[in-house]
């Protein structure tokens, strides 16, 4: 029984480590409705490392297509969790653009699609409003882009729950 309790507590502590707000807030002004998501790999070696070595081996997918596919999944899963929020996540370049952008900054990614990323919320002037770290477990089969997409969709779902917590609809 003690062993089960210890394992349960260990599981909770590890899962709480996988998601945390590092600084700032994720509360948006009351008039803001849209939140744009985009990649930002400038603070990491991610783009340089994976475009040259990994992405050419992704069964016909290339990095620009993989990025687009993955971010669409993140937006979809975020919006599922944002249902109780006044915020709608949108893709970069869509007609509906918000004054705030949430940048996905990949930190770690393995061949199974397990990932850890920093998510940075910035306003229209580029000022950092909030910073959080989320991890997502990748998939079990498919192309590397699909495995990566599974992991980022799970992280997007957690992120949607966080943004909902900060931006609940007023009654």
Regions found by a protein language model. Give the residues of each.
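Bacterial Sec-dependent N-terminal signal peptides
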Residues: 1-24
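Generic marker of residues within folded, mature protein domains
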Residues: 6-10, 27, 94, 109
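A structural "domain/chain start" motif
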Residues: 18-73, 165-171
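C-terminal/domain-edge helix-coil "capping" segments
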Residues: 19-28, 127-171
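Generic secondary-structure microfeatures
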Residues: 39-41, 79, 105-110
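Mid-chain, structured segments of secreted extracytoplasmic proteins
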Residues: 65-93
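Surface-exposed short loop/turn segments
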Residues: 85-142, 146
């Amino acid at each position: 029984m003690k062993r089960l309790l210890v394992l349960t507590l260990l599981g909770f502590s590890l899962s709480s480590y996988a998601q945390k707000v590092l600084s700032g807030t994720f509360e948006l002004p009351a008039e803001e409705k849209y939140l744009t998501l985009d990649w930002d790999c400038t603070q990491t070696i991610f783009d340089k490392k994976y475009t040259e070595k990994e992405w050419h081996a992704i069964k016909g997918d290339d990095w620009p297509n993989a990025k687009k596919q993955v971010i669409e999944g993140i937006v979809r899963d975020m919006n599922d969790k944002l249902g109780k929020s006044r915020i709608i996540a949108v893709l970069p370049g869509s007609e509906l653009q918000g004054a705030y952008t949430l940048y996905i900054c990949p930190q770690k990614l393995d061949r199974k699609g397990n990932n850890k990323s920093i998510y940075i919320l910035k306003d229209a002037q580029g000022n950092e409003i909030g910073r959080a770290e989320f991890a997502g477990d990748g998939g079990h089969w498919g192309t590397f882009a699909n495995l990566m997409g599974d992991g980022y969709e799970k992280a997007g779902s957690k992120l949607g729950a966080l943004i909902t917590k900060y931006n609940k609809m007023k009654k």
